[in-house]
């Protein structure tokens, strides 16, 4: 290999930024292939179970700024930052066009409840910062200031399963679903409270949804981050919308956390 290339790779490794090749694990239900040029804010969270094991994609995330990734609390709760990497700028798990940054801090919401799934939001702090100005496939997204209206179309992106326990895809997927009334969502999930910190989206007939592997990924409305993939009953089942962390509800919490490290 050319000595110049070797030197460049060595420098990138020391900086904590390097090309990545990832493995396939699934995709959005009812969606279609999309490009990182249209989903520049989407990242992969990769985790290893121990210092001697390899990294594997576990959740999605969303770029808020060069050092801040928004994701679901259940993706990072009781985990160590040193066991995570963030893959950005690549829509394919098997590609070599993305970059990786190491994680320096995990900030799950202090009131996250794994039983009720309330406050299922977290921030992931990366170091070094993502080189947003150097890549046309990476870009931060603005946070929604208000909860989206019922019926508005929202876009979900991720690498989760195509169906419950279904097939997988190397390519990032995207699908549109309408925002669902919280009262109707509560009727569907009568056994678990739909709190103010939750947002529901999906089709009454089912067929389109996030699924396993999409957790932590973004739900976007009008080019703003409105929700974070959290939980649901199966995947794309009729009358069971997906449930998301309501980002607008947590905007003050996000701002407060960012002041501690930005």
Swiss-Prot record:
Mind telling me which SUPFAM superfamilies this protein's record contains?
Answer: Trypsin-like serine proteases (SSF50494)
Any single GO BP term: proteolysis
Listed under catalytic activity are: Preferential cleavage: Arg-|-Xaa, Lys-|-Xaa
Point out the signal peptide segment: 1-22
Recorded hits in CDD domains, A to Z, give: Tryp_SPc
Q: Which residues form the Peptidase S1 domain?
A: 28-259
Required for specificity (site feature) positions: 209
Q: Which GO terms describe its molecular function?
A: serine hydrolase activity; serine-type endopeptidase activity
Gene3D superfamilies xref list: Trypsin-like serine proteases
Q: Name one GO cellular component term.
A: extracellular region
Annotated propeptide span(s):
23-27
Q: List the disulfide bonds.
A: 59-75, 185-200, 211-235
Which Enzyme Commission numbers does its entry carry? 3.4.21.4
What keywords are assigned to this protein? Disulfide bond, Hydrolase, Protease, Secreted, Serine protease, Signal, Zymogen
- Quote the subcellular location field of this record: Secreted, Extracellular space
Active site positions: 74 (charge relay system), 120 (charge relay system), 215 (charge relay system)
Q: What is its main location?
A: secreted
UniProt similarity note: Belongs to the peptidase S1 family.
Name of the protein in its database record: Trypsin eta
Protein source organism: Drosophila melanogaster (Fruit fly)
């Amino acid at each position: 290999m050319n000595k110049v290339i070797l030197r460049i790779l060595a420098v990138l490794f020391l900086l904590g930024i390097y090309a990545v090749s990832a493995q396939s694990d699934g995709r959005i239900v009812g969606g279609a292939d999309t490009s990182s040029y249209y989903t520049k804010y989407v990242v992969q969270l990769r985790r290893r179970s121990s210092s001697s094991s390899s990294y594997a994609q576990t959740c999605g995330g969303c770029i808020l700024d060069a050092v801040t990734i928004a994701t679901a609390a259940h993706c990072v709760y009781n985990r160590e930052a040193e066991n995570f990497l963030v893959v950005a700028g690549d829509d394919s798990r098997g590609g070599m066009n993305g970059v990786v940054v190491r994680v320096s801090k995990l900030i799950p919401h202090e009131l996250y409840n794994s039983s009720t799934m309330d406050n299922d939001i977290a921030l992931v702090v990366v170091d070094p910062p993502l080189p947003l100005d150097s890549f046309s496939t990476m870009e931060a997204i603005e946070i929604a200031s208000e909860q989206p209206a019922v019926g508005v179309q929202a876009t979900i992106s991720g690498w989760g399963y195509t169906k419950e326990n279904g097939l997988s895809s190397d390519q990032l997927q995207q699908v549109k679903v309408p925002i669902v009334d919280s009262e109707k969502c509560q009727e569907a999930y009568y056994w678990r409270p739909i709190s103010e910190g939750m947002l529901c989206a999906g089709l009454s007939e089912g067929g389109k949804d996030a699924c396993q592997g999409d957790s932590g990924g973004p739900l976007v409305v009008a080019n703003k981050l409105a929700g974070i993939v959290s939980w649901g009953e199966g995947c794309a089942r009729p009358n069971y919308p997906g449930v998301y962390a309501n980002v607008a509800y947590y905007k003050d919490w996000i701002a407060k956390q960012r002041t501690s490290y930005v």
